[in-house]
UniProtKB/Swiss-Prot annotation:
Function of the molecule: May act as a substrate-specific adapter of an E3 ubiquitin-protein ligase complex (CUL3-RBX1-BTB) which mediates the ubiquitination and subsequent proteasomal degradation of target proteins.
Species whose genome carries this gene: Arabidopsis thaliana
GO biological process, one term: protein ubiquitination
UniProt key word Transferase: no
Record's compositionally biased regions (Polar residues): 615-627
BTB domain residues: 25-96
Annotated region described as Disordered, given as residue ranges: 611-651
Protein name: BTB/POZ domain-containing protein At3g44820
SUPFAM superfamilies named among the record's database cross-references: POZ domain
Record-linked Pfam families: BTB, NPH3
Amino acid sequence: MSPVAKVSEFHREGNDWFCKTGLSSDITVVVDDVKFHLHKFPLVSKCGKLARMYEDSKSTDKQSLWTTVLEEFPGGADNFLIVARFCYGARVDITSKNLVSIHCAAEYLEMTNEYGEDNLISQVETFLHKHVLRNWKDCILALQSSSPVLKSAEKLQMIPKLMNAVSTMVCTDPSLFGWPMMMYGTLQSPGGSILWNGINTGARMRSSGSDWWYEDISYLSVDLFKRLIKTMETKGIRAESLAGAMMYYARKYLPGLGRWQSGTSDSSKSRRRVVSFNLAKASSPSSMPPLDQIALLETILSLLPEKRGRSFCKFLLGLLRVAFILGVDGNCVKKLEKRIGMQLELATLDNLLILNYSDSETLYNVDCVERIVRHFVSSLSSSSSQLPEFSPPSLDPVTSPSPAPLKKVANLVDSYMAEVASDVNLKPDKMRSLAAALPESSRPLYDGLYRAFDIYFKEHPWLSDRDKEQLCNIMDYQRLSIDACAHASHNDRLPLRVVLQVLFFEQMHLRTALAGGLNVANTETAHAVTIPGGRTGQEIVQRDGWVTVVRQNQVLKVDMQKMRSRVGELEEEFQSIKQEMKKRVSKSSSSMSSPRLVKLGCKFLLPRASDAKNDTVQNSVSSTPRSATADHTLPRSSRHSKHRKSFSFFG
């Protein structure tokens, strides 16, 4: 009786495997230093490769015991043991977990129907088409288990078939076929209720969302995940769904990325965990290949679609932060910065605060943010740099860029500068370069930039007036609000030159406001006078209302005339102070200790406080509010307060 006809048992002794058939072994097969002492007939009758090797060895080797070594056998010794059992007639359980590895081994040994009816390759392909390709869970498990033999599986058509099947299931409504309903471990009644032992429990199955498959494909290796995403792209799956799968995969394997992303609710987590219990053993650390996080980040970046979105921009900023932590290649960082810059108006301050992980002394990576801002500015001038939205609100093409994104980014940059201004190691040139990265038209008001500079001056009291003036020169004082001007005029952290310029432009604002108020009052009075008197009750009420308005406007007009007169008086006092200071400057110009002159934005000169003396200027204007301007013996805070008062129209 041949060994195949007997019920064969395999046992191991050390590093050798033996088959109990009652006959002595006449062939030794070595796989990964493991020896299998077997018999020629069952192996040669099923394996075309071994049959050919045996025929070649008979002409050269006359020994009764034949030894052969199988190099790079797919799946190793454990997989060859399964094939050997099949050759000896033992029943082999083909599952979705060992399907790919057995197929690779059968192809390696050429186990076709030519060497036996219903050979191993035929059985594997039958199981694939009848059971695996129709079931989501089996497809995912088969793909995941193919990682150890992926190099050999590349030559087969099984991997593309599995990926096409998975992509088709993702494109299709899962409730139509029941796959993924069966993966929850429960059955459904025709009405949708969950069945337990055939009994209707009354509980309803939670409907699966569009992201139900994210968790399952996250168990795949990086290479398989990349190939699957590309296959899904060819199937026409929406870019939003693919981006969501990639974001989910990256958060799972990149350290710290999940902390900076929005959390997932418990309900969505339970909805996504379709086959997590079935994959628990297969996805253990021992079975998962070692993950190269830098390669993963670069792979994710290469797969991400060229789209824009609020959560997508947040994810890109998280990737950039992780890239700095891992120390990835500079080209990868540049690509991330450029893609973030093209949608910077969708970012938030929290995501933009990227810590400095290099040897720099600054706490935050200000250079990176500046590069992102410059990418944003350059993208506005190029129509080809405009990224499409994931879900555009309308189908109308955008013909011209809206000024709103520029304003949003300006507010974001000003808030960022106010946040990083407290860093004592932040140099003035960094602040100046970041503030100047945006064009002047981006800021309708400079209040945010003024606030950032004020915080910076407070945390850096050792700065010289020259450094402060260089920073303040970026601001347009005409675009400061009344409140900001009022604060700046009392701010003892600002240089004297800046304070006087702010006071000058504040006066211009007030004069413009007064002129506008007078024009409005005159217009309303003219309209009120021309209203004809009527005899109906409604017209009488309207006439009385206009009479009241006229009286109020007349009172307002008188008050404004008084204010205008007061402004004239202040201007005369201002000119007298200016002439007096010119005389003092001409007298002291010949001395070696002559005071340094400060050129004002409003075209007049003031001596430094350190060179001023209490002389005739104080006496000449002591009875006016301007007298405090020449009182150089007061501290800086008092001087600034007096400057503010001197330009007040109501003091």
